[in-house]
């Protein structure tokens, strides 16, 4: 009887976790996290703490406001 309870619990847990994924298990074709961070570095007005957080057309970090600005 215990084996049946454990098996039932595993089945219900599996069904609940499968139902929690609305689009099913699809692959993510988006760029990697590192690529996303590199793309965001080139945006003016992005939050920053030092010049390493900024890049592209806005390479300087305005530490008073905490955003990337043009030179």
Curated annotation (Swiss-Prot):
Keyword annotations of the record: Disulfide bond, Knottin, Secreted, Signal
Gene Ontology cellular-component annotations: extracellular region
Signal peptide boundaries: 1-18
Keyword Disulfide bond: yes
Disulfides per UniProt: 44-58, 48-61, 54-68
Entry's transmembrane regions: none
Keyword Signal tagged: yes
Subcellular location: Secreted
Superkingdom of source: Eukaryota
The family this protein is said to belong to: Belongs to the UPF0499 family.
Domain characteristics, as noted in the entry: The presence of a 'disulfide through disulfide knot' structurally defines this protein as a knottin.
Protein's recorded name: UPF0499 protein ACLA_083080
Organism, scientific name: Aspergillus clavatus (strain ATCC 1007 / CBS 513.65 / DSM 816 / NCTC 3887 / NRRL 1 / QM 1276 / 107)
